[in-house]
């Protein structure tokens, strides 16, 4: 049974963005829904395609009053390079650690030391509205499905 489920508050966190600024989750919730996109890393081609697909529909997420935040165990340099290469306009947070992975009940690949993908859509008060945790690079909710979810809640 997952630790986090709809109605539970997500753990707060502080991570440094690729530009070196501290990002505090709860200070940035505001009045919008927030979609946390946990991805494997810049090295994962499927993650790159997925993040690019999210970027292509960013205006629709904003129209659905939803901000996107992508998180990984990447280094700040790798995260910055990926953000620039893909032209991502949403927040990218590198430096995800094992404590956060455990707090969010994500699948962790012990052999290669990275988290598997997950999506958490949270309300402005920090409670979970929807989540999907995968155990491999495949099986993530499609962008169209995510837009349908954020538009209907």
Located regions from the model:
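Chalcogenol-based redox active-site neighborhoods
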Residues: 1-153
